C-alpha cells in the first residue's frame, strides 16, 4: 500500500507526497516549494519525481525553487506533465504509462480536460491524483474547457474502480457539500458523509482522500444521470434539461453562483 502524505500549502491546497521505500519521494503539484523542502528534510527523503496535473501557479509555482534546492544538494528530479508545460521533462499524454524508480507499479496518465485544456490525472495503484478536475463533493470550474469535455473527463474518472482513493488538490469539501445538499437534500449517503467530514475537519484532519464509490453516491457532478439531480437543476434553471451534458453545464453554473 502506498504511503501518501498531505502537505498543506496556501489557504487550502494539498501537495501530495508519495513516500517511497527506497528513501525517495514523488510529489504531486508543488505549488509552493518550502513546505515540500521542509517535509523532505524532516523525513530525510530525496525528491525523485514530480507529477504535474495542470499549469495553474498554485500547482506548479514551486518547481524552479525545488530544482535550485535539489541542485544545491547534488540531486535532481524528473517532472512529468502535459506537453504544453514548460516544466515537463517527460511529456505525458492520455493512455501513457510511466515507470518511476521506487514505485512498484507504473503510473497511468489520463487526459481530463475541462478545468484547463491540458489537465492530466495520474493513477498510481489504487490512488487517483486528479488535481482540480474532481473534488470531493464537487468539480473544478470551467476556466478553459467546456461542459462536454468536463462530462467526458468525469465519466473517465468515474469508470475507475469504486475503491479508488481520490486525492484532489484542495480542501473544498465542506463548501462543496453545502452545495450538494442544496441539490439533493434527501440524499442519505450525502447526509452521512457531511457528518463524517465535519468530524474530520473539527479534529483538524484532511477530509481526503475520498473514494470514487463515495463520490458516485454524494457528488452531484457525478450524478447528472439521476432523476433527482436532473429535477433539481431543471427547477433551479427554470428550463428543460434535455441531456446529461446540459445538466452538468447548468449545475456548474449554479455552483459558480452559489
UniProtKB/Swiss-Prot annotation:
Annotated binding of Zn(2+) 1, by residue: 54, 56, 115, 132
UniProt-listed SUPFAM superfamilies: Metallo-hydrolase/oxidoreductase (SSF56281)
One Pfam family hit: Lactamase_B
Ribosomal protein is among the record's keywords: no
E.C. numbers: 3.1.2.6
Primary enzyme class: hydrolase
Protein name in UniProt: Hydroxyacylglutathione hydrolase
Species of the source: Shewanella amazonensis (strain ATCC BAA-1098 / SB2B)
Amino acid at each position: 500500500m502506498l504511503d501518501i502524505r498531505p502537505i498543506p500549502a496556501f489557504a487550502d491546497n494539498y501537495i501530495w507526497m508519495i513516500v517511497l521505500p527506497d528513501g525517495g519521494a514523488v510529489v504531486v503539484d508543488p505549488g509552493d516549494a518550502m513546505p515540500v523542502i521542509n517535509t523532505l528534510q524532516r523525513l530525510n527523503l530525496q525528491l525523485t519525481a514530480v507529477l504535474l496535473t495542470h499549469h495553474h501557479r498554485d500547482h506548479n509555482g514551486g518547481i524552479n525553487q525545488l530544482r535550485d534546492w535539489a541542485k544545491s544538494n547534488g540531486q535532481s528530479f524528473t517532472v512529468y506533465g502535459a506537453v504544453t508545460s514548460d516544466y515537463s521533462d517527460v511529456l505525458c499524454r492520455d493512455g501513457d504509462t510511466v515507470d518511476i524508480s521506487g514505485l512498484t507499479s507504473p503510473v497511468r496518465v489520463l487526459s481530463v480536460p475541462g478545468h484547463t485544456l491540458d489537465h492530466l490525472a495520474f493513477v498510481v495503484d489504487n490512488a487517483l491524483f486528479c488535481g482540480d478536475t474532481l473534488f470531493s463533493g464537487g468539480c473544478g470550474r470551467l476556466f478553459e474547457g467546456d461542459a462536454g469535455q468536463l462530462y467526458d473527463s468525469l465519466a473517465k474518472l468515474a469508470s475507475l474502480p469504486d475503491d479508488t482513493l481520490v486525492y484532489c488538490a484542495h480542501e473544498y469539501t465542506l463548501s462543496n457539500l453545502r452545495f450538494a445538499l442544496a441539490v439533493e437534500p434527501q440524499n442519505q449517503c450525502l447526509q452521512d458523509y457531511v457528518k463524517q467530514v465535519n468530524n474530520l475537519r473539527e479534529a483538524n484532519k484532511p477530509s481526503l482522500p475520498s473514494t470514487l464509490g463515495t463520490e458516485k453516491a454524494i457528488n452531484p457532478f457525478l450524478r447528472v444521470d439521476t432523476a433527482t439531480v436532473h429535477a433539481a437543476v431543471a427547477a433551479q434553471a427554470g428550463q428543460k434539461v434535455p441531456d446529461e451534458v446540459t445538466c452538468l453545464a447548468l449545475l456548474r453554473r449554479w455552483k459558480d453562483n452559489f
